[in-house]
Design a protein with these regions (language model features):
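Exported/periplasmic ABC-transporter solute-binding proteins
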Residues: 1-125
Length: 125
């Protein structure tokens, strides 16, 4: 088995370490990649390779494996049955106003959430 991973300091790697690996370390022999796209390409082009990847980077070039018998679907991630999900947060300095509020209203509205889904991510609403 060829292990592929994101580089140290990657948010994707940090989430995988925390949620899956816990105190175990990723092998020193792992092929390290600087982006999720490069990680996907490595798995797609390397026989016997395995890696972890953000939902939005999944495509038909790689096979997504179930965890604990649960498929990695939008529904399973949203309802909490898929065991590896990481929330992301939006932060502002104080109460959002002006263009910041307009952006948040847009991205959380129907049109913005449709864009989120079209990009391969899971909408929050």
């Amino acid at each position: 088995i060829i292990v592929a991973s994101r580089e140290e300091g990657s948010g994707t790697r940090d989430a995988f370490q925390e949620l899956v690996m816990r105190d175990a370390l990723i092998t020193e022999n792992a092929i390290l990649q600087q982006s999720n796209g490069a990680l996907r390409t490595t798995v797609a082009n390397t026989p016997n390779a395995i890696a972890y990847l953000s939902f939005g980077y999944l495509d038909k070039s790689v096979k997504v494996l179930p965890l604990d018998g649960v498929e990695a679907t939008e529904e399973n991630a949203s309802n909490g049955t898929y065991p590896v999900v990481r929330p992301l947060n939006m932060l502002t300095n104080g109460e959002p106003q002006g263009v910041v509020k307009a952006f948040l209203d847009f991205i959380l509205g129907p049109e913005g959430q449709a864009i989120v889904r079209a990009e391969g991510y899971i909408p929050v609403k």
